[in-house]
């Protein structure tokens, strides 16, 4: 259902902190023109933690409007309160989105059975497909393979974004689920390896900056041309690491500002704009990768 390169899109903001919707449209157009296979609205990279519900929902609505059915839009709907996750999902269900991305509840460290109850409740509350999102580096709680397998039996839970970077875990999960269950990498550094091990796509931060290369890499891997996929991945490998020198999405925003795609690299507190050394480093990497001339 959801395969290829899905970009974990940033949420552009003016220096005042308000959402910059003209730049958001420019970004959506940029991804359509450069072959991205889908957009993730207001996930981790979209600063979901600092967008109140009304803004969160409005950004999703605008992205759907700008995408104009030319590219799928999946909305981040995760929360560490099951009631809030359900509320968000219900509010966004009628916006025209193609599905939800729902993260493992963070901070309160639910048990595995608690995760099962949480995600089943979220999926029961919608008619749209749900992607699970496991990112223990941010949430602390880790959704284990047997838990994924149990949740995969729910008819609305169609896949998993796995940001562990652990290819062995992917291989462990594959025989536990139906063949139609989708595995998407949430770790750019290991995304190509994930695809060659049988993954179906990526939800990528790097794709903010090089959408064409990421979509071409995915297309090559999914067609079985692993040598071409690895060749493309090597061309952008420096970007994979450079974009994460500071917490995401600090440097992706600065890179897009440098590319002229957004008007400001502003982030909402507690995130702040990148250090000069980081900016100089990623600018050089962008030149090395052909992003900047």
Swiss-Prot record:
Pathway(s) this gene product operates in, as recorded in its UniProt entry: Amino-acid biosynthesis; L-lysine biosynthesis via DAP pathway; (S)-tetrahydrodipicolinate from L-aspartate: step 3/4
EC number per UniProt: 4.3.3.7
Annotated SMART domains: DHDPS
Disulfide bonds: none
Pfam families, alphabetized: DHDPS
Site feature Part of a proton relay during catalysis, where: 44, 107
InterPro entries hit by this protein: Aldolase_TIM, DapA, DapA-like, Schiff_base-form_aldolases_AS, Schiff_base-form_aldolases_CS
Biological process per Gene Ontology, one example term: diaminopimelate biosynthetic process
Tagged with keyword Transcription regulation: no
Catalytic activity: L-aspartate 4-semialdehyde + pyruvate = (2S,4S)-4-hydroxy-2,3,4,5-tetrahydrodipicolinate + H2O + H(+)
Keywords noted in UniProt: Amino-acid biosynthesis, Cytoplasm, Diaminopimelate biosynthesis, Lyase, Lysine biosynthesis, Schiff base
Keyword Cytoplasm: yes
Residues bound to pyruvate: 45, 203
Domain of life where this protein originates: Bacteria
Catalytic machinery residues: 133, 161
Localization per record: Cytoplasm
Self-association and partners: Homotetramer; dimer of dimers.
Family: Belongs to the DapA family.
Function description: Catalyzes the condensation of (S)-aspartate-beta-semialdehyde [(S)-ASA] and pyruvate to 4-hydroxy-tetrahydrodipicolinate (HTPA).
UniProt name for this protein: 4-hydroxy-tetrahydrodipicolinate synthase
